[in-house]
């Protein structure tokens, strides 16, 4: 049997999960991927959110990082059945298997009074995670060299065009976290280097970035001065919602727009320093975009 520590990760095919997986591998962990379509030549088990998980799948696993979230369900009953109940089954299996460290990757979009179904689902999962003895982390907008995810899409949009649609007035506040800072903290907790009790932590630098200012900063790195075309967000939401009701498959959902337009104005960063969670300020000059 290998002496390597084993980390089970869900959502490793996504941007955040992939960053976490890669960092754990660099730190010498053996990775057990839980995925709908396991990649060839990887240690993996077939995993579908919402389905039962056998505790035996976690034999000798030292840590579980739950990053997966299924965006396909659009109605609350479907979201709850897949993502919330699915997380409950996963955490129950992890507890039965006596996994020492469990980490749930929530979202800064999850907060009391949030309006998006995504945020509400994450809140429900947070409660289950805490009851299961998990550490809950709410990352802000995750970025890094060669970024994927939402930040990568923003970079691609600014790079390809000098005319950028602006949903609303661009005043929506974003809090950012470098993928390395996020991954380092998760690994330090999983390895036992950081000893803290199960709690909720917001993983982001405390500097607020208005959405428009963030796009201007990205554009500046390309030497561009973009022109913004304002679009009323409720009109865009209505169009997205209508398309969804017609059964069209979209890359950006109406609920994601609700989340973007209704962020937490005052995330709680009060416990970060004591917990050892350090998030660098966003500096576009230091990125390879």
Which residue stretches match the model-derived regions?
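Conserved Rossmann-fold NAD(P)-dependent oxidoreductase catalytic core, especially the SDR/UDP-sugar
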Residues: 85-123, 131, 135
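N-terminal Rossmann NAD(P)H-binding glycine-rich loop of SDR-like oxidoreductase domains
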Residues: 5-27
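SDR active-site strand-loop-helix element
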Residues: 10, 34, 67-68, 102-108, ...
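A conserved pocket-lining segment of Rossmann-fold NAD(P)-dependent short-chain dehydrogenase/reductase
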Residues: 156-177, 185-189, 197, 202
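NAD(P)H-binding glycine-rich loop region in Rossmannoid oxidoreductase-like domains
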Residues: 39, 47-89, 93, 108-112
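Glycine-rich "substrate-gating" loop/helix at the edge of Rossmann-like oxidoreductase active sites
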Residues: 140-147, 168-180, 204-207
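Mid/C-terminal beta-alpha module of Rossmann-like enzyme folds, strongest
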Residues: 189-250, 276-289
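Conserved beta-loop-beta element that borders a ligand/cofactor-binding pocket
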Residues: 127-145
